[in-house]
């Protein structure tokens, strides 16, 4: 009986120490887990709007990737480098610059604000991408109609 209580208590302590760390959250196969989100590069070539639509169909809350920190940018760059087909040199991300009523606005496709800025150039009504020549670490703006691979991101559900 004492051993059972000891083991049960140990398991309870382990469970409580892991709660809130992403334990129990799982990404589908072929997706990567990082900082409470799932990520995946798709080597299909789509324009920005089609890629965003495609991402939203992958899972609840999915969008083109939003990048909130330098560490997340490093993770995305690593994941893209590991999984992009050799012939591709760009991938779409969820950042879009729009000019509405002569007011420029920059937002991620998930609706969140830009809190980490890694843009090299800024133009009106453009979409953002990562380039191979920078190790997929710097953001560039480009036409939203170009068809290139893209990265999706979503928060996993319990």
From Swiss-Prot:
Primary subcellular site in the record, as a coarse category: secreted
Keyword tags: Disulfide bond, Hemostasis impairing toxin, Platelet aggregation activating toxin, Secreted, Signal, Toxin
GO terms of molecular function: toxin activity
Domain of life (superkingdom): Eukaryota
Domain C-type lectin: 34-158
Keyword Secreted annotated: yes
Family: Belongs to the snaclec family.
Additional note from the record: Negative results: does not act by binding to GPIb.
Name assigned to this protein: Snaclec convulxin subunit alpha
